Amino acid sequence: MKKSRTAIHPAQVLTGLIAASAAVAFVLNSRPAMSPGKVVLITGGSRGLGLALAERYARSGARLILAARNPDELVAARQTLLDREALQSPDDILLLPADLTDAAQATMVIDQAVSHFGRIDILINNAGIIEVGPVENQPIAAYRRAMATNFFAALHTTHAALPHLLNRNPGEDDAAIVNICSIGGKFAMPHMLPYVASKFALVGFSEGLHAELRHKGVRVTTVCPGLMRTGGEAHAEFTGQTKKERRWFTLAANTPILTASVRHAANRIYSAVANGRAEITITPQAWLAARIVGLAPETTQYLSSLANHLLLPTPSIADEIQLGFTLKVSTYTTSEGSEQKITPGQ
């Protein structure tokens, strides 16, 4: 008599994987919190996720350094933390206005932070910008802006901080670097190519840092949030049919079922860093997207293309940019110039 075999449906496998992942995450996030008194530097710390992280760490007894471009927003952030009674003392926070896309200013921020508090325990690279619009309407300058803020600012602060993070006193806890990347660094979202390119770069840098520094006393956590209700749409740059682009992005960024609150994200990040996690993905949709793109990259690209075709605005013909550009080639550098014409297809 033959034994009957019960077929396992792919959905059952997926459900099992999700349940197992949730169980592992629960165990990892249930470990004790980090000890108080840490010195935490947060870039982009004046609003959104940066401010939520500042509040979470302040409530744990950390001393804060907040860096951002706008000094008025930094002052407002400090007042918010004081009003919410998150800070134990006004002396526990240092505000450093700076443009971190400038390596010299990033070094100045690190030096002033160490001079003021004596050390840095945790560096959180959170500063970022968003550029939204179809590729036909995105100038090269948009990619340069995104790379400068989303990638090079983190690179500048990391390089400036590394000597301090590596030079720990015997018996001290490991230092930590936290890179706030994005699911956009795992999954190429259409109409956000400057953002996607910069976040892919940051994910690669962050994962490589973890490999190199894990056994040198510096833990690196790569954070890949999905959509969050940060209010970032108010500060995003839109190209193409700007009203339509703003509409779809704002709707997606503020739909509760698709997004996470910044407080929830800050709590997840705090726990991940305290527990030495190498990487976390925030929101179930982002977790699922990251795994699907890893298992079926071609299928994911077809689905993304379909969404672009059916759901997103068409390019603005009036604002189409000249896709060709010129390169001037020398022995030492490659810069924009007029000697060689490169056109699409070459």
Predicted regions and their residues:
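SDR active-site lid
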Residues: 215-286, 302
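Conserved glycine-rich Rossmann-like NAD(P)H-binding loop of the short-chain dehydrogenase/reductase
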Residues: 60-77
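Residue(s) in the substrate-gating loop at a strand-loop-helix junction
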Residues: 182
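The beta1-alpha1 cofactor-binding region of Rossmann-like NAD(H)/NADP(H)-dependent oxidoreductases
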Residues: 72, 97-108, 140
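Active-site helix of classical SDR
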Residues: 158, 198
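Conserved glycine-rich cofactor-binding loop
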Residues: 46-47
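Substrate-binding pocket helix/loop in short-chain dehydrogenase/reductase
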Residues: 134-135, 139-144
